[in-house]
Amino acid sequence: MKKLTVEKPWGQFKQFTHNELSTVKIISLNSSSSLSLQYHNNRTEFWRIISGHPIVTVGETTTNASPGDEFFIDKLQKHRIETKDEPAQFLEIAHGDFDEEDITRLEDKYGRA
């Protein structure tokens, strides 16, 4: 995915997709929760933190994230987002063959791995 920033006299806009098949979600995490440590075979993902200060893992890198931080996740790349004392919300844009079953869970605190 190629992100485009276009400057205008009134400010700017960021374009995340252009005539591409994609699935767009805003995901809300409760405090003290986490997605599985997982990967996908058939899609890439882009995450942009909207609110909160989640802990984001992409590959071998773990980041204490803040609103506005962005992350790109390749096919087969392990990733997770988790919260501690506060909830968080993030934008997810998935490209490729999107299927909710295309999740390989490596670790999961809810017993789904």
Set out the residue ranges of the language-model regions.
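Short acidic-glycine-tyrosine-enriched beta hairpin
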Residues: 59-78
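Active-site donor-binding loop signature of nucleotide-sugar glycosyltransferases
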Residues: 29-31, 67, 75, 83, ...
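Structural motif
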Residues: 34, 46, 53-55, 78, ...
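Double-stranded beta-helix
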Residues: 1-8, 80-113
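A short glycine-rich, His/Asp/Glu-containing loop-to-beta-strand
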Residues: 2-39, 43
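Short, conserved beta-strand element in jelly-roll/cupin
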Residues: 27-30, 39-56, 93-96
